[in-house]
Amino acid sequence: MIQRMISTLVALALAALPLSAAEDQKEADRLDNCGTVLKEILDIPDNIPTDLLDKAECVIVIPSVLKAAFVIGGSYGKGAMTCRSGEHFTGPWSAPAMMRLEGGGIGFQLGGQATDFVILVMNPRGAKAILKSKVKIGADAAAAAGPKGRDAAAASDVTMRAEMLTYSRSRGLFAGVSLEGSTLRQDNGANEKLYKGNLTAEQIVRKGAVAVPPSGQEMIAFLNKKSPKNLSDPNSLKE
């Protein structure tokens, strides 16, 4: 009887291994997709202005969000966040932490095709707020639809004071978009699968607890090449 129970438990454990591996690979594939989407967006002619990217402390990418995700049972998109390393956000881009974008009026902005979102976090206060737990966009952190191309020079004071600048790409069209009312939070389950440990987003992004995983290397290498230095006013980085 005991031998049979042991055999059953071993069989169940072995059966669970492929499922666990598949879940881990799903997070790796999602992170790899974040890098692909970010590179595609930053390579288009009329994209996020370079001077804004150079002043961003963090970049968040939420790829391939479908309207159904915000209507049927779930209401969230999944992606990744990376920040400039160092005490004052002046170093190379960090290992990425997995994030979730939830609720708000996002579903009403989505069509039938997948939509990609990119969020620039423009000051340390906004970055630290996200890394603590969660942020409601527009309430806990001021946000604005980001300007694109040459529009940066003519951006309004409201836009330039925003802690987050938000963008979307859908059906080949790229534009600033309002995400007010939505919530950003760290995806602890995804981070655990990706890094094989119970790590917070702050430990991953700010504490340097892990190296960049293979699936995140394209995203981080591209950012380090595209925007190697933080060109923000040094005084604004001492919060």
Predicted regions located by residue number:
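Bacterial N-terminal signal peptides that target proteins for export
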Residues: 1-9
